[in-house]
């Protein structure tokens, strides 16, 4: 693109173009998938449309192979790397969960230490269960008013690196679900000075690569790997993601790690959506996210004018634990109207037909992205104003803290695979948990394998259940019982 920052022709979408060419060839399918371009499953075709099922095809020479790309998929990955300023990019069809796990499995082996905040997505801890690495937690500060965890302070990271000089990597959220950013450039430098990799969970930061006035992206900050949820703010289909790597990471080894866990039947619907969405962002991303940021700022002003709500933004920035803030994130504190965030979340859907991203103990998040319009913002603002009028209470008995510092007893892998027993929830106090417990979204564990179960945590779990949070993780779907390490206090 002439006059742009890109080196390659970002008007090109090789997977999409190859699929269009293949469609015109009218090839007779004697391969999988068995619906045979939709003919074998007319109900599915009626639901999804012929154009969709017609390109739900298998890997073949004209369309390349995700496990070992040599033509159109490889081209698409090179274009993605160019668009995002990375040395290499990998198309991921197992969502950013797969991307995050690949980062950790690439950096760590059994017994290695990795420095990370505790408010990470469960995919990070899942990877520790798989590879046997040992977490060194940097417990984030908590904003006392909002009850949310913030970023990692520079001095906390520096201390962790000094105390654990053999750690192999530092992992950073860029940003958190709420839009909070740590000082990524400084953390990258500290990690590299100590001979460690810096990994970024950038599930909520796709737009950082294309928007002006937004926090620094992981690749621009010099991080070694970043997991980017293109489907969240980039416009691709759900479950599609990108894994980005810097120049000091061996791309061939990363591909081998990916192929340990990712499907051998990569969806061309997902891959083509990544290809088309990358092209769209390269061509129009800066304009799009400028508009998104403007909408979010307008919504913040309007919501704060209602009274009783606090739509927080850049005023949280303190130069350290909140080094920067993603202004596209529309996070709203609700406790001052006497309602938990999850209660407002449910009311918006059930009473006003508005589905927001999530509600937690004290906040809601409305996720704004490339598909939002001003009229939807007005509808959300009006609904919040009416909720305050109809449902406001005195708020007695509401919890306010979203984050509880963990008491780590043993590694996630050791605890997950250890002998265990199932106990009624209230009888687990003081025991060591051997499974995950979390509200989803956001998917940040309240408890992880290897952590001690405290009365405070049990109170939180029961409160979150009572308020209607979607609780996931344990074997018992009702979370009346938990698995704990047998014979271990």
Locate the predicted segments by residue.
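Conserved PLP-enzyme active-site core in the AAT-like
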Residues: 5, 9, 15-20, 24, ...
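Structural signal for conserved beta-strand scaffold positions within catalytic alpha/beta enzyme cores
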Residues: 91, 137-139, 228, 358, ...
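Conserved C-terminal alpha-helix-loop-beta "cap" of PLP-dependent enzymes
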Residues: 298-474
């Amino acid at each position: 693109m002439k006059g742009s920052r890109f080196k390659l022709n970002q008007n090109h979408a090789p997977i999409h173009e190859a699929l269009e060419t293949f469609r015109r060839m009218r090839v007779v399918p004697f391969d999988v998938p068995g619906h045979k371009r939709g003919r074998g499953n007319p109900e599915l075709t009626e639901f999804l449309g012929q154009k969709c099922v017609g390109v739900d095809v298998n890997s073949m020479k004209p369309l390349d192979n995700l496990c070992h790309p040599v033509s159109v998929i490889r081209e698409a990955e090179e274009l993605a790397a160019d668009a995002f300023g990375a040395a290499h990019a990998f198309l991921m069809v197992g969502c950013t969960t797969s991307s995050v796990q690949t980062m950790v499995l690439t950096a760590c082996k059994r017994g290695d230490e990795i420095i990370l905040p505790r408010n990470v997505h469960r995919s990070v801890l899942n990877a520790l269960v798989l590879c046997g690495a040992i977490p060194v937690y940097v417990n984030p500060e908590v904003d006392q008013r909002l009850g949310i965890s913030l970023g990692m302070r520079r001095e906390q990271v520096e201390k962790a690196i000094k105390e654990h000089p053999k750690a192999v990597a530092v992992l950073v959220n860029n940003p958190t679900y709420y839009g909070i950013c740590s000082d990524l450039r400084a953390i990258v430098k500290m990690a590299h000075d100590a001979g460690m990799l810096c990994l970024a969970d950038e599930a909520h930061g796709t737009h950082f690569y294309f928007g002006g006035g937004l926090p620094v992206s992981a690749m621009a900050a010099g991080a070694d790997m970043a997991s980017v949820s293109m489907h969240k703010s980039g416009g691709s289909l759900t479950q599609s993601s990108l894994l980005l790597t810097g120049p000091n990471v061996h791309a061939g080894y990363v591909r081998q790690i990916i192929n340990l866990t990712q499907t051998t039947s990569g969806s061309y619907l997902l891959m083509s959506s990544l290809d088309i969405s990358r092209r769209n962002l390269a061509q129009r991303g800066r304009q799009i996210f400028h508009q998104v940021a403007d909408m979010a700022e307008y919504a913040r002003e309007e919501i704060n004018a209602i009274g009783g709500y606090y739509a927080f933004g850049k005023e949280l920035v303190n130069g350290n634990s909140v080094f920067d803030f993603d202004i596209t994130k529309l996070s709203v504190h609700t406790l001052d109207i006497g309602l938990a965030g999850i209660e407002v979340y449910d009311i918006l859907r059930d009473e006003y037909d508005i589905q927001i991203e999530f509600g937690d103990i004290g906040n809601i998040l409305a996720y704004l992205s490339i598909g939002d319009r001003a009229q939807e913002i007005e509808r959300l603002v009006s609904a919040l104003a009416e909720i305050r009028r109809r449902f406001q209470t005195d708020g007695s008995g509401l919890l306010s803290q979203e984050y509880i510092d963990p008491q780590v007893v043993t590694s996630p892998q050791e605890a997950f695979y250890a002998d265990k027993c199932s106990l009624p929830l209230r009888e687990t106090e003081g025991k060591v948990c051997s499974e995950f417990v979390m509200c989803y979204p956001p998917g940040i564990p309240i408890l992880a394998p290897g952590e001690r179960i405290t009365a405070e945590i049990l109170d939180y779990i029961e409160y979150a259940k009572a308020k209607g949070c979607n609780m996931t993780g344990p074997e018992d779907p009702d979370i009346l019982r938990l698995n704990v390490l047998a014979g271990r206090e």
